Amino acid sequence: MFSKKPRQVWTAGVATLFPRSFPGTLGMSICGKALDRGIWALKTLDIRDFAVDRHKTVDSSPYGGGPGMVLRPDVLDRTLEAISDVPGRRICLSPRGRRFDQAFAKELAHEPGVVLVCGRYEGIDQRVIEAREMEEVSLGDFVLTGGEIAAQALLDATVRLLPGVIGSEQGLDEESFEDGLLEYPQYTHPKIWKGRSVPEVLLSGNHKKIAAVSYTHLTLPTTCS
């Protein structure tokens, strides 16, 4: 009798100066339940634990001058070495780099895991980014104080795509940005609220008409583009 090969748990490794930020909202709702059920695992490392001096120094002033401080490559390299057992791509959250989107989330969901580095200060020494072959990934054209919020957003979008996390595959297929379209508006009880009624077609029971109206909304352009 053959025993089934145990399923590899999708694992996220996070290197951060603020480990208490995790799991944060990832420990709640759908992602939190999936974490409790062992569908995915989270390993968080405090970058400061890998400092090379007794003062736990993790940053230094940039060569060439300029404002702010830069995360040291030696400290971050030691951190990444300690998390080398986590499989998958290495990603540095940064205002520059590839824009994270739904297609990217799907890519990561098909990986065995991912390691995320949460930047702080003025950024990370470029040498460790290159030496560790990290991908630089951005959530958009804006600046956050650090990469922790970006890391949580990236993981939330990815974890919900893992098998067994969302109960309805149809629900995933119909979400916004699948096939490049936006999700249609949703309505629930009460039927009339503050003088506003649910569209009559949704009350008709005619599934063909409902599908047609839904598709019309799907094809409307997003104002965020």
Predicted segments, located by residue:
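N-terminal nucleotide/polyanion-binding subdomain common to many enzyme families
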Residues: F2-I83, L203, K208-A211, L218
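Short, solvent-exposed amphipathic alpha-helical segments in soluble enzyme
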Residues: S29-A34, K106-H110, A131-R132
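Conserved small/polar residues in nucleotide/adenosyl-binding loops
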Residues: T216-T222
